[in-house]
Amino acid sequence: MIAKGYTNIWVLDISANAIEKAKQRLGESASKIHWIVADVTDFEPPVQFDFWHDRAAFHFLTTEEKINKYVSIAEDAIKENGYLILGTFSENGPTKCSGLGVKQYSEHSMSAKFEVGFNRIKCVTEDHQTPFNTIQNFVFCSFKKK
């Protein structure tokens, strides 16, 4: 994204180690990014975003309290007519990841979680090949903020 001229990029991860690896991979370009180490359900964004992309964090939220908190944060943090892209394990995907339980979603169940504040654009379900040569079934949905 940086190479394409995007600015005001924020990256949030619960893992400081993951953030450090990403910074090292980006080299000098890492200084152009706002890096946040936090649990997304504790995140209080100081700005609103045009675009929010989450690939494989949402499915680690397994309680209704955490799920609802995430949805509320996304609704508040994304600008009107902004976009939300989510990728989670599908109902045919793994039930655990990195030793942790996950919540699986269908295109319908994920859309239902966000229907109050967002209009669904499109959902697709697809297989993802991991670096360990295993297959994981994901559902990806895109939404537009109402």
Tell me what each language-model feature is:
Residues 53:
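A conserved beta-strand element that flanks and buttresses the S-adenosyl-L-methionine
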Residues 56-60:
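Short catalytic micro-motifs in class I SAM-dependent methyltransferases
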Residues 50:
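Conserved acidic residues
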Residues 1-47, 61-146:
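Class I (Rossmann-like) S-adenosyl-L-methionine-dependent methyltransferase catalytic domain
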